[in-house]
């Protein structure tokens, strides 16, 4: 027989027309004008190869024409239905009925001489059927109905011979070239290239290229390229490229590219790219890219990109990008990007970006960005940004930004920004900004900004700004601004601005502005402005402005302005303006203006202006103007003009003229002329002319001219001209001109001109001009001009101009201009201008300008300008400008600008600008700009811009921009832009842009752009499984399984399985299985199976099976099977079978198709003026007459 040609059987109508309208010739050549080399029925000629296979496409009409054509084997493409083939051209060699065509083909099979012979040796023949390229994506299709098998051999054997030739029934079909060996049992088909060996059991199908070896049990299907080796048990299907090796037990399905090796147990499924190696136990599913290696025990599911290695125990699930290595015990779930390495014991869950390494104990959860390394004991949870390293014992929870290193003992919690290093004992909690180092023993809590170093003993709490170093014993609390160094023994509390150094004994409290140095014994309290140095023994209290030096014995109290030097014995109290020097024995009280020198015996009280020298005996009171020298005994009052020198004891009253020097005791009244220097004790009243210097104790009233210097005690009122310097005690009111310096104790009110320096005690109110420096005690209110420096204790309110530095205690409110630095205690509110640095303890509220750095404690609210760095404690709210870095503990809310990095703890809400990196704890809400990276735990809600990567835990809601990659736990809701990749757990809802790739559990609702599975916009194509819901815009194409619901706009195509509901606009095409409901607009085409309901507008075409209901508008065409109801408008054509009811408008045609046992015949009626009445239902009665369907109690009317 000729090996180059094959015979194909098909049927046409009695006019030789096929279903596409092509008229076949009675003999000669026929060719398709619209040929396409695909495995679909359209765009080509189709038929039954050698007349054996499915009967679904052969006409059952009695007048059908049965055509036999001769086709070149090289042109044949096999279709999915048994025996069906497709070809572009053919030669018609026979036209007749079913029996004659069957005899014709059987005779040609039996007679080798009936066709032209080839030069090859005759062999048992089968027709090679070239296999087209298989698409890399397999679309789900509706369940196909089963049809009877047609075989020309059985037809020829059953029919009476008519000029018969001998008829034979082929049991095997074999085709091979030279050097091949083929051996097959009954009903097998073997096709091989040269040099191949094929052995098959019953009902098997083998196809192989040259040099291949195929061995299969019964009911198997093998396809391989050249040089391949395939061995399969019964009921298996193997497909491989050239040079591959496949071995499978019964019931397995293997697909591999060229050069691959696949070994599978029973009932397994393996898919691999070229050059891959796959080995699996029973009931497993393996999918790998080219060059991968996968090994799995029974019940496992592995998916990997090209070049990957996966090893899994029983019942495990592994997903990896290309070049990854995964090893897991039983019941584990591993997900990794390309180039990653993951190793896990049983019951673990690992998720990592590309290039990561993850090692986990039993029942652990690891999430990491690309390039990270994670190692954990059992029952641990680790989350890390890209390039991080995390090591944890059992029961720990670690979260870190990219490039970080975390090491934790059992039951610890670590949170760090990118590039940080954290080491903790058991039961500890560490939070750090990027680039920080934290080391803590068990039970400690550490919070630090970026670039900081923290070392803590047992049960300690440390908070630091960026670049700080903190070392503490057990039970200590340390708070520092950026660049500070703090060292404390057990039970101490230290707070410092940036660049400060604090050393404290046990149970001490230290507060310092930036650049200060503090050293104290146990149970001491030190407060200093920036750049100060304080040294105190146990039980002392020191307060100093910036640049001051304070040395105190036990139980002493020192207050000094900036640049002062104070030395006191035990139980002393010293107050000095900036640049002063004070030396006192035990029990003394000294008050001085800036630049003064005071020396006092025990229990003395000295008050001097700037640049003065005061010497007093026991319990003396002296007051002098600037430049004066006063010496007083007990209870003297001294009054002197400027440049004067006064010496007085308690109870004296001193008045001095211009340039005088006055020294007076307690309760004195001093009046001085222009340029005078006055020093007064308790309850004094001082009045001085222009350029004077005044010094007074508590309850004094000072009035000075322009350029004066005033020093007053508690509850004093000071007024000074331009360029004055004022120092006041408790509850004082100070007013100064431009460029003044003011120093006051608690509850004082100070007003100063431009460029002033103010120092105030507890509950003071300070107002200063541009460029001022202010230092205030507890509960103070400070207001300063541009470029000021402010230092205040707790509950203070500070307002500063541009470029200021503010340091405040507990519950303070700070407002600063552009470029400021602010440090505040517990529950503070800070507001700063552009480029500021802010450090605050818990429950603080910080607002900063562009490029700021903020560090806040527990429950704080931070707002920062563009390019800021923020570090906050537990339950904080952070808002930052473009390019910021934020680090926060649990329950925080973070908002950042473009390109930011955010790290947040449990239940946080993060919003960031374009290109941000966010890491959040459990139940967080994340929103990020274009190109962001987000990592979140269970129950989180993530929103990201274009090209983002988001990883979230269970019950999360993710929204991402164009081209994003989202990974989430079960029951999640994901929304992504164009071209995104989404992976979600069971019962998830996914919405993605055009061309996305979605992976989800069953019963999910998916909405996606063109090429994805679910809801899509205009012009999209949706493909879904059974029981799906699809909603699409105009000109869409929807494909779904049985039981689905489809809704689309006009000019759409809808395809669904049985039991579906379809709704579309005008000019749409709807196809559905049985028991379906279809509704479409005008000019639509509807096709449905039995027991369906079809509704369309005007000029539509409706086709239904048996027991259907069809309704359409005017000028429509309706066709249905038996027992159907057809209703149409005017000028329509209705075709129905037995038991159907037809009703149409005017000028319509009603056609009833009846089967008389031999052939179909038609009864036709027309509606209108010359026909039957329109809009009346008609049917065919038992006498084959068309009658209208009667209502109840009406007689039927026969239509003639």
From Swiss-Prot:
> What InterPro entries does UniProt report for this protein, alphabetically?
Ice_nucleatn
Its localization reads: Cell outer membrane
Q: Which residues cross the membrane?
A: none
Q: Where is this region: Octapeptide periodicity?
A: 176-1151
Q: Which domain of life is it from?
A: Bacteria
Name a GO CC annotation attached to this entry.
cell outer membrane
In biotech or industrial settings, the protein's use is given as: Used by snowmaking industry to promote ice nucleation for artificial snow and economize water. Sold under the name Snomax by York.
Q: What is known of its domains?
A: Contains 122 imperfect repeats of a consensus octapeptide A-G-Y-G-S-T-L-T; further on a 16-residue and a regional 48-residue periodicity is superimposed.
UniProt-listed PANTHER family = KERATIN-ASSOCIATED PROTEIN 21-1-RELATED, PTHR31294
Q: What else is known?
A: A structural model is suggested in which the ice nucleation protein displays a symmetry related to that of ice.
Which protein family is it in?
Belongs to the bacterial ice nucleation protein family.
The protein, known as: Ice nucleation protein
Question: What is the organism of origin for this protein?
Answer: Pseudomonas syringae pv. syringae
The gene from which this protein is expressed is inaZ
